[in-house]
UniProtKB/Swiss-Prot annotation:
Pathway: Purine metabolism; 7-cyano-7-deazaguanine biosynthesis. It comes from Xylella fastidiosa (strain Temecula1 / ATCC 700964). Keywords: ATP-binding, Ligase, Metal-binding, Nucleotide-binding, Queuosine biosynthesis, Zinc. Catalyzes the ATP-dependent conversion of 7-carboxy-7-deazaguanine (CDG) to 7-cyano-7-deazaguanine (preQ(0)). Belongs to the QueC family. It catalyses: 7-carboxy-7-deazaguanine + NH4(+) + ATP = 7-cyano-7-deazaguanine + ADP + phosphate + H2O + H(+). This is 7-cyano-7-deazaguanine synthase. InterPro entries: QueC (IPR018317), Rossmann-like_a/b/a_fold (IPR014729). Binds 1 zinc ion per subunit.
Amino acid sequence: MKKAVILLSGGMDSAVVTAIAQSQGFMVHALSIRYGQRHTSELDAAVRIARALNVVAHKVVDVDLRSIGGSALTDDIEIPDAGGEGIPVTYVPARNTIMLSLALGWAEVIGAADIFCGVNAVDYSGYPDCRPQFITAFETLANLATKVGVEGTQLHVHAPLQFLSKAEIVHEGLLHGVDFGLTVSCYRADVDGRACGRCDACKLRVAGFADAGVVDPTRYMELPCSLLLL
């Protein structure tokens, strides 16, 4: 069987991508990054998801992006309830570039030619490293900057959710048996994994489940207004 490295954050998108890679016959090696994010609930979720999906291997790597700063997800900056104009303060400088680079390194070591990530260009918050152009550019880099690429192995970076709406991602996950109750999407999740119900990530998740006509299994500290209207 072919091997693949999947970036598994613990959120719903990366959980769905992990299940998709498995359905395509890949031996899944899941990679999670402890980068200095303000809460560890998402990483705890990644461990639960990896166990539930019975991946071949799950590695958690430490990278201290908090020492660089520049994001509300790593710094002591208030996380807004609503997104503003331009790139939001929850953007983490170079995060996806660094994470994909680590995935690329592990892929080289284990002999995997495929990397999967859950970036999305439809229901996303304006992050530049979620755009299709970024994924295409990184795949080019991967084949230029690695020993295996130079020696002739074609490396592929897959973003199967890139052009799906959040509702479509929900349906895709259910089709592949993903337990969304294990996942954490919230920027402000507490130690028990309960979501705030107010941040941009929560709003996207709530809207996705509502549009899909599926009950959201998330435990919310504060019930989102859209759910109160149902």
